[in-house]
Amino acid sequence: TGTFNNANPMVIVDGVEASMNDLDPNDIQSVSVLKDAASSAIYGSKAANGVILVTTKRGKAGKASINYSANFGWQSPTELPEYVTSAQYATLTNEARAYAGKTPLYTAEQIQKYADGSDPYNYPNTNWQDLLYTESGFQQQHNISINGGDEKVRYMTSVGYQGQDGIIKHASKDQYNVRVNVDANPTSKLESNFSISYSNIALEEPTNPYVGGLAQIFRQVNMISPMVPYKKEDGTYGTIGDGNPIAWIDMDATTNKKRHNMLGVGSLKYSFLPELSIKGQASYKLYAEDSNEMRKDIQYNPNKYHGPNQMWQKDTFEDQVMGDIM
């Protein structure tokens, strides 16, 4: 869901604001969505774009059970824009010039060479998207959980791993999750709940020496003309003013991020009467991220250079303690 400024809905996990990216999908029991005005009344201005309520799995009374699940898959672009070929571009350019009363820019022989690929270095027809999306996009997911307890104490603990290879070179994600949920009823009137979760996420993505970041690579791939060769006959790169996006991929320059996220939630509820109770809840959130971006210089050809080498590093640390009485 998104509105102005690409705003996202608020995510509440077991009563505390969190991120869906840090969850193991195997730990989710239920998901519900609030979109009416009541959500803003309950959660404030952050809920203006709706609220996603996530409940994680809890322990059940009974003999301890161990469960393992795994799945595997591959990703590919579902739909890509179709761009004109070099021959089509040349033909359309000539037509536009004819409407303007100008002479053709391309001869019939040149258009034919663009179309038949007989001289790919001088009359290229580069499919930049084919050069970008070269990887399998293999992904895997594993989760093992233990569930059990009795009427007094119940527990659910799980360990998960998600591995995801990108559909472009040097793009990957590895995520590890650990969760422990414990529920207890020491007396008929007292109920306690405790949850602690931890996620460790490692991300890698290609960057570039032009302005840095992955977004610029996608931008240039969707802008550069098919008439620009990926490489020339002498092995140097064809370029536009901004460079060559596939040359950036070839440089093996990457941004690497490591994220650590921990969330602990505890609550106590005392019921005086079936209709009257008091509940206290406290939570602690910790987030840390290390980001390193290596921008490598590149000599595309004798006349075009981007550089010099640069290393960008950013460290982030945040923690938060919250409490409520309801």
Language model features: what each stretch is:
Residues 149-152, 184-188, 270-276:
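Outer-membrane beta-barrel strand-turn architecture
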Residues 23-26, 43-48, 171-174, 208-210:
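Short, glycine-/polar-rich solvent-exposed loops and beta-turns at beta-strand/coil boundaries
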Residues 9, 14-41:
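Short acidic/polar hinge/loop motifs at secondary-structure boundaries
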Residues 60-125, 136, 166-173, 177-263, ...:
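Surface-exposed loop/interface segments of Gram-negative outer-membrane beta-barrel transport/assembly proteins
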Residues 3-4, 18-20, 37-42, 59-62, ...:
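Short beta-strands and strand-coil junctions in structured, solvent-facing domains, enriched
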Residues 6-8, 26-28, 37, 47-51, ...:
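Extracytoplasmic
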